[in-house]
Amino acid sequence: MHGSVRREGESPSTYSIADNVYMNSKIHAIITGDIVRSESIGLDKRDGLIKTLRCALEDLQRQSSMKMEMYRGDSFQIIVDNPVKSLRIASMLRAYLIGNAPEDEKNGWDARISIGIGAINYKGESIVVSDGEAFRLSGRGLDNIEKDRLAVATCWEDVNEEVDASIGFVDNLITSLSRNQARLIYLAVAEELPQVEIAGRTGKSQQNISKTLNAAKEPLLSRYLNRFESLITKYCGQ
């Protein structure tokens, strides 16, 4: 991957969820991302990767309506109408990719993701022609992400100070997940299923589910996401 921000003149492919449904608030979240080590993914697996990404976005509609466009083959940008849920969506998008990578994919699947939360001054039919602070924060964040895989920037300095000091925890937690941990943490955090229901769905004992989720630090992740969502809710309401 040689960049992170959509370049003028690039023709994105669009995958929309609730294209014309937007919050009344002018504050939105923009998720800009690209696939980690995309150049090493075989051509025979590219279609499966894109399908997995789209399936994740469709399922995560339970958290917020969204619109996604892909460009350059390995990059994507998403407008998230409910910024409160943006970090949950971004982290669970990564977990979905990790958990659904083919067993024979040596390096697995993952994405580098930057979240920008702020105003959108102009919202066109296509994300490529839209503009605003949220887009700039998200694009700049991915350009500067270096070796990390998750970044968040908002239009509120107080929020940025708190998030900057702690977002590395979420990044490291998601990056460290095994395929099995990622699949279970997705059910617990994205679908918000109780452990007994996860056990029934996966055919594993509740004891096994609890042990795996604790090893994956799911309770700490859920607590952090709840704190982030409370913080963004507070500032969006000001």
Label the model's feature ranges.
Residues 2-6, 10-238:
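Regulatory and interdomain segments flanking nucleotide-handling catalytic cores
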